[in-house]
């Protein structure tokens, strides 16, 4: 009997027979993942190149591109529920790479009560989403995008800026005022505690952008224009002299303690690169699993992994992008070695199986689910065995 081969589910699909051959999708794609068929002129998607930024989806005038993450139906459904949950008519749309904590949002836009909507890239937000929000009672929309030069998807931030500018002109003509949609930009940067710096140079060695430099008398200075906020230098600093806005060491420690207390055993904590795993807008948390989403797998600190085990977590899974998919100059690939080194040390005391590192991509939505299911099964077996 021949083995049945099942096709891998993909996150983005193009209905080629309905394509109008307008060429907009492959003009905006930052990764050359969409090609023009030489004979028909229709769009063809090369899924292995696709990074699921959503730019093609938001730009297609014929609506022949489908995306399973944060599409029009899921976003508008979320807004309908969120208006009641947050009791607000102000919407704040944030790129995951630019968004500070909620207090930071308040400082940016001067709002204290709002509906938060965090997406991998604001470039995927279509005109229809803005119009649907306005026509269903949203009075004010704020958009927080990455600085144009720091967009993880290269073109998402500048494209959305132009889209919002054009839409504001239309909305003004329809009587919604001169700036119905407010756009601001933000990039999260590393922070230096000079009194703790020991001048070891680790940050200088590891940074993909040459942002840190040592100055006399051995104190690190950061070129903030060069810093892309991957967090690799923070994870590699032995003196805890560096921190990253919104992903500070103490904040992550607080989340670890909170999640360990919330979960039922066997407890699994997942450190995710937020570009490798896209969460659903309103996932009901599994009682055994919690997630800490990071700006890059490079921000995974082995001290946090040890801390998780110390607080009662039974298994830790690190989910990263493959090096070729990394949005931060392959910084995430440098996270694997320290995690595997810790795994080896844990193996010496019989705990190596309780830590795992995997690479996944949102283009294949089921891939992470499989990794988590396999790891969860292993941790459950260990828990049962040790509880016997």
List where the protein language model places each region:
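Primarily the internal scaffold of c-type cytochrome electron-transfer domains
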Residues: 69, 73-85, 92, 246, ...
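A glycine- and Lys/Arg-enriched "phosphate-lid" helix/loop adjacent to the NTP-binding pocket
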Residues: 324
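Short alpha-helical segments and helix-capping/turn motifs at coil-helix boundaries
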Residues: 77-79, 126-129, 256, 301-303
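Long C-terminal interaction/binding lobes of large macromolecular proteins
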Residues: 313-314
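Ferredoxin-type iron-sulfur electron-transfer modules and their immediate structural context
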Residues: 1-35, 87-131, 135-216, 266-297, ...
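Short secondary-structure transition/capping segments
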Residues: 40, 80, 153-157, 257, ...
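Iron-sulfur cluster-binding cysteine motifs and their immediate structural context
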Residues: 20, 24-46, 51, 55-73, ...
């Amino acid at each position: 009997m021949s083995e049945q081969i099942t096709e891998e589910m993909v996150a983005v699909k193009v209905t080629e027979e309905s394509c109008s051959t307008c060429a907009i999708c492959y003009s905006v794609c930052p990764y050359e993942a969409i090609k023009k068929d030489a004979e028909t002129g229709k769009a063809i998607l090369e899924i292995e190149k696709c990074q699921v930024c959503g730019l093609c989806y938001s730009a297609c005038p014929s609506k022949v591109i489908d995306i399973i993450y944060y599409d029009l139906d899921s976003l508008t459904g979320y807004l309908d529920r969120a208006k009641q949950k947050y009791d607000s008519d102000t919407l704040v749309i944030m790129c995951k790479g630019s968004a500070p904590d909620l207090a930071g949002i308040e400082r940016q836009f001067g709002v204290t009560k709002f509906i938060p909507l965090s997406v991998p890239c604001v470039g995927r937000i279509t005109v229809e989403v803005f119009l649907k929000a306005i026509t269903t009672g949203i009075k004010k929309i704020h958009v927080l995008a990455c600085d144009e030069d720091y967009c993880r998807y290269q073109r998402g931030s500048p494209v959305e800026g132009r889209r919002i500018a054009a839409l504001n002109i239309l909305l003004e003509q329809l009587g919604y005022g001169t700036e119905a949609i407010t756009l601001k930009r933000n990039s999260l940067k590393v922070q230096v505690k000079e009194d703790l710096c020991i001048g070891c140079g680790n940050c200088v060695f590891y940074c993909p952008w040459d942002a840190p430099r040592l100055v006399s008398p051995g104190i690190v200075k950061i070129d903030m224009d060069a810093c892309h906020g991957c967090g690799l230098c923070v994870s590699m600093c032995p003196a805890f002299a560096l921190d990253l806005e919104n992903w500070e060491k103490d904040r992550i420690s607080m989340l670890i303690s909170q999640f360990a207390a919330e979960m039922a055993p066997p407890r699994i904590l997942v450190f995710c690169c937020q570009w490798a795993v896209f969460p659903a807008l309103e996932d009901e948390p599994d009682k055994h699993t919690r997630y800490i989403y990071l700006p890059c797998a490079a921000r995974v600190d082995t001290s946090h992994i040890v801390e998780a085990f110390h607080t009662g977590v039974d298994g830790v899974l690190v989910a990263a992008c493959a090096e070729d998919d990394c949005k931060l100059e392959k910084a995430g690939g440098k996270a694997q070695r320290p995690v595997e080194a810790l795994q080896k040390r844990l193996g010496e005391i019989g705990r190596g199986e309780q830590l795992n590192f995997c690479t996944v991509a949102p283009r294949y939505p089921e891939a992470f689910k499989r990794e988590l299911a396999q790891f969860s099964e292993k941790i459950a077996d260990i828990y049962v065995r040790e509880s016997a």
